Amino acid sequence: MSAIGVIGGTGVYDPSIFENIHEESLMTPYGEIDYVQGTYKGKTVIFVARHGKDHTIPPHKINYRANIWGLKKLGVKFIISTTAVGSLNKNFEPGHFVLTDQFLDFTKNRVTTFYEGGNRPVAHLDVTNPYCPELRQIIESVGKEQKLSIHNGGTYVCTEGPRFETPAEI
């Protein structure tokens, strides 16, 4: 059975809702990741704190490739990633959940691919639908059952941190 991966962003660091918790680390070709493994309702969950367990890794220093490679190595098929963000959409209020369906990546100094040349042929990733529609549908259904304010669809815009956007960028 596949594990479920959770990458927790700012404000999501407490995996205590899981049972049978144990902390581990894994060396990947891209560096080491720390993670917490546990179970939730009988499912194996692998939790990675995006900014590190002590919230000390700034956005531009996060080892995204190690996190993703490590989760795949650990048997994760689905990843739920949380983040605390602002919104330009007045319908998205604080505390609402937005299931993004598109993204704009305005970062400049982050590695964005596993491909670095060499013996492997060039690979181009199709990001027409960058987020899994089936997983988004499951999350939306569960969110509605739980009476959460949930929006299915939104564009995540990522700018280079660690800073907030300028008024012109917004």
Describe each region flagged by the PLM:
Residues 130-170:
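Active-site rim beta-loop-alpha module in soluble metabolic enzymes
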Residues 1-127:
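Metabolite-binding pocket within alpha/beta catalytic cores that recognizes anionic/polar moieties
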